[in-house]
Every structure is written in structure tokens, then in C-alpha cells.
UniProtKB/Swiss-Prot annotation:
Residues passing through the membrane, by range: none
Family: Belongs to the outer membrane factor (OMF) (TC 1.B.17) family.
Name this protein carries in UniProt: Uncharacterized protein HI_1462
Pfam families membership: OEP (PF02321)
GO CC terms in record: membrane
NCBIfam families in alphabetical order: outer_NodT (TIGR01845), ToxDrgExpTdeA (NF047721)
Any one GO BP annotation for this protein: transmembrane transport
GO terms of molecular function: efflux transmembrane transporter activity; transmembrane transporter activity
């Protein structure tokens, strides 16, 4: 009776000492906030393998190769497995723990001659902590949520990898076409230079005209060198993504950038369709993990009840070691609130961790919304830029022909023709870049929404 009164008193003291922050309301509000994004996202169909929309079997192969070979993604997979192992380890606390031991000993007196006394001992023990307050269950839940968050981290890495592969693939395609166009420009200026050289010999052109043509050739060659440097950097990026060494061939025949048909973006889908984003899911899961961990830590004020049982035996011979087993049982109660100063600050730390996770979640939501909104804007801008440049290029072609005719008629200087031709060639390169920007921006939309929405 006296012992029961002590246990009751301990429980009352524990309840009086809790005094923990009420984090349940803010956690529930965050869950409701996430639920609204889930409901909006469910209203639309999503195609998560958006790169297949380009109908490019080679691109599909390259993406698949990256998913298999990329080391960052492999490390993310290891992190997921580790989180799973940790969750399983924490879960082991919910089941009884077993251990056993055996030993043998020999004793004899050293002052007289006598035989040794030999004894053999064996024991089997089991212990179990009663989870009266669901503290252990909360700890297990926290570990499981952490594992789910790590799995979403891997999905984020996968999403980023795919986006990088697709954009780099089309960047190299653009640079290949830019180099080819620049080669045509160099030939164009070289032909003009040859004409000027011939006219100089004939005495119908001056040396300045020849120099101007050579100047245009050198400028075009420098542009080509710049494009080649960019292509080498892009190839390095793609090799890193595919985990290919310099001596290993890419084995890729890149398409012409202007022949790539864009998949488009459904701008009627609201920017709030973000629940499919793995980084948003990870932030929400980490919030749940921090909440469960804080609840478990708050319950560390409460008494802990441990049950134990053992079975042991001692004998002088191995054959009779189990003939006289002795059973024992134990009940232990620990009172952690007596160490109130340590428990108090551990609780405060866990609550601060929860608050950090809550702020991280809210920040991630805001970042995701702004990310989608900005990518929508960038896509529409890229489309408009491409359309304007294509129209401008038509005018530039007509202007170049105009000054070429005037020069041939002897009523205009070569410099005017070259300036017009340079503007035309620059706009041609700008169109290639603008087409790449359209592809890049639409892929940024797909990546920021974790798929193509219909």
C-alpha cells in the first residue's frame, strides 16, 4: 500500500512539473496549410517523366543513364537506407530486449593439496520498458518521419539531376548549332575578304576595305572560340552528371535546337500546385518528426517503468547446469523529474527544434510558390523574346541585302554592308539562344512543379 502511494505521488509530481509549451495547435495549423496545397494539386493530372514529351529516344536514354550512374543520387540512396536503419533501431526499443551469458570457474586452496572446485553458471535475461505515456512510440514516429523526409531528399536530388541533364543536353545542342552558324559567318566574311582583295589588286577598292573584312573574320573566329569553350564546359557538366571520365565517349548525336518541338506549359495551372514537390514534402515530414520528438521529450518528465525477468542456474558439471534453475523478476521505476534542470532544458531544446522545423516549412512553401511564379514569368518572356527575334531577323536579312546592293552599285561603303551583315548574323545566333532559353525555362517549370500538369 505504501509503495502504491509513492507511485501515485510520483505521477502527480510529474504532471505538475510538465509545464511544456503547447505546440499541438501550431502543428495542426501547419497540417491544415499543407492539406490545402494537396487538395489543389489533386485537381490536376501530372506527368512526372516530362522529358519524354520531347519524343527523343536518345534523351530518354541519357536521362536513364544518369539515374543509374550519378554518384550524388547514389549517395542520396545511401542516406535513405541509413535513415531507415536508424528508424528500425529506434523501433527496437518497443520490444523486449534479451541477453544471456555463460561462465565457468575453477577454485582451489593454495595452502594444501586439494582438487579444484569447478562451477558452471548460465543465465537468460529479458527486460522491457512499459511505454505508459507513448514516449517511446513518439520517438519511433519521429524516426519514421525523418526517414520519409530523407526519401524525399533523394527524390529532390533525382528531380534536380533530371532537370540538369535535360537542360545541359539542349545547351550542347544549342552550342553545336551556334558553332555551325559561326562557321558559316566566317565563310561569309572570308568570301567578302577575297572579293575585297581582288578589287584591291584591280585598283577598285582601298586597303581599308580589306582590313574591315579581316576584322569581321577575326571577330567571328573569337565568337567561335567562345562558343567552343562554353561547349567544353557543358560537356564537362554532362560527363559529371553521367559519371563519365574524359576517355569515355558520350556517344550522343545532339539534335538541332530549332528542330526540337517544345512541350509547352499549361499556364492555367495555379502556382499553388506544389504538393508534388519533394522538397515541400520533406519540409512537412521534418516538421512532423520534430513535433513527435518534442512530444517525446516533453514526456521525459514522467516516471519510467522497467520490467525484468531472469532465469539462472549453477552446477558443478556442465551436464547438470540446467537442473536447478532459479527464476527472478524485477520492477524498476525511475523518476527523471528529480533531475529537473537537465530535463527542463532538453525539453526547451526539442521545442526550439520544432519551431525551427515549422519556420523551415513555412519558408519552403513561400520559396516554392515564388519559384513556380518566377518560372511561369520566365517561360512567357522567353517565348516572347524568341518570337520578336525571329521577326527582327527577317528585317535584318532585308537590310543586309539592301546595303549589299548599294555597295555593289557603288553608292554605299563596305562598312555599312558589314555592320548590317554583323547585325543579321548576331540575330541568327540570338534566335538559337532564345530557343534554348524557351526549352530551359519550360523545364524549370516542370522541375519546380515536379512534373508536367495537364
Amino acid at each position: 500500500m505504501f509503495k502504491m502511494k509513492n507511485i501515485t505521488l510520483a505521477l502527480l509530481m510529474s504532471g505538475a512539473l510538465v509545464g511544456c509549451a503547447n505546440i499541438g495547435d501550431s502543428y495542426q495549423a501547419s497540417l491544415e496549410d499543407y492539406k490545402q496545397y494537396e487538395e489543389i494539386t489533386k485537381q490536376y493530372n501530372v506527368k512526372e517523366n516530362w522529358w519524354s514529351l520531347y519524343d527523343d529516344a536518345q534523351l530518354n536514354r541519357v536521362v536513364g543513364q544518369a539515374l543509374i550512374n550519378n554518384k550524388d543520387l547514389a549517395k542520396a540512396a545511401v542516406a535513405v537506407n541509413r535513415a531507415l536503419y536508424s528508424a528500425n533501431l529506434v523501433g527496437a526499443n518497443l520490444v523486449p530486449a534479451f541477453n544471456g551469458s555463460t561462465s565457468s570457474a575453477a577454485q582451489r586452496r593454495v595452502d594444501i593439496s586439494t582438487n579444484s572446485a569447478i562451477s558452471h553458471k548460465g543465465s537468460l535475461n529479458v527486460s522491457y520498458t512499459l511505454d505508459l505515456w507513448q514516449r517511446l512510440a513518439n520517438t519511433v514516429d519521429a524516426a519514421e518521419w525523418s526517414h520519409k523526409a530523407t526519401a524525399e531528399d533523394m527524390e529532390s536530388a533525382r528531380l534536380s539531376l533530371i532537370n540538369s541533364v535535360v537542360t545541359t543536353y539542349y545547351q550542347i545542342a544549342y552550342l553545336n548549332d551556334a558553332i555551325s552558324t559561326t562557321n558559316e559567318t566566317i565563310k561569309y566574311y572570308t568570301d567578302i575578304g577575297n572579293i575585297m582583295q581582288t578589287r584591291l589588286v584591280q585598283g577598285v577598292a582601298d586597303a581599308a576595305s580589306v582590313d574591315q573584312a579581316q576584322q569581321a573574320i577575326l571577330t567571328a573566329r573569337n565568337n567561335k572560340l567562345n562558343f567552343e569553350t562554353q561547349r567544353k564546359t557543358a560537356e564537362q557538366t554532362l560527363r559529371n552528371l553521367l559519371n563519365l571520365k574524359p576517355n569515355e565517349a558520350l556517344n550522343i548525336t545532339f539534335p538541332h535546337i530549332m528542330n526540337v518541338k517544345t512541350a509547352g506549359v499549361n499556364l492555367n495551372v495555379p502556382v499553388s500546385v506544389i504538393a508534388n514537390r519533394p522538397d515541400v514534402k520533406a519540409a512537412q515530414f521534418r516538421l512532423s518528426s520534430a513535433f513527435k520528438n518534442a512530444k517525446a521529450t516533453q514526456k521525459s518528465w514522467f516516471p519510467e517503468v522497467n520490467l525484468g525477468a531472469s532465469l539462472s542456474s549453477t552446477a558443478s558439471t556442465v551436464g547438470t547446469a540446467l537442473h536447478n534453475p532459479v527464476a527472478a523478476g524485477t520492477v524498476g521505476i525511475s523518476l527523471p523529474f528529480l533531475n529537473w534542470n537537465t530535463v527542463k532544458w532538453n525539453v526547451k531544446i526539442s521545442e526550439a527544434d520544432y519551431e525551427t522545423a515549422r519556420l523551415n516549412y513555412e519558408q519552403r512553401i513561400t520559396t516554392a510558390l515564388n519559384n513556380v511564379d518566377t518560372n511561369y514569368f520566365a517561360f512567357t518572356q522567353a517565348q516572347s523574346t524568341l518570337s520578336n527575334l525571329q521577326q527582327t531577323h527577317s528585317y535584318n536579312q532585308r537590310i543586309t541585302q539592301y546595303y549589299r546592293n548599294r555597295y555593289n552599285a557603288g553608292v554605299s561603303e563596305l562598312r555599312e554592308w558589314l555592320v548590317a551583315a554583323n547585325t543579321e548574323k548576331s540575330s541568327q545566333l540570338a534566335i538559337l539562344n532564345a530557343k534554348y532559353q524557351v526549352l530551359q525555362s519550360e523545364n524549370a517549370v516542370y522541375s519546380s512543379m515536379a512534373g508536367y500538369y495537364l
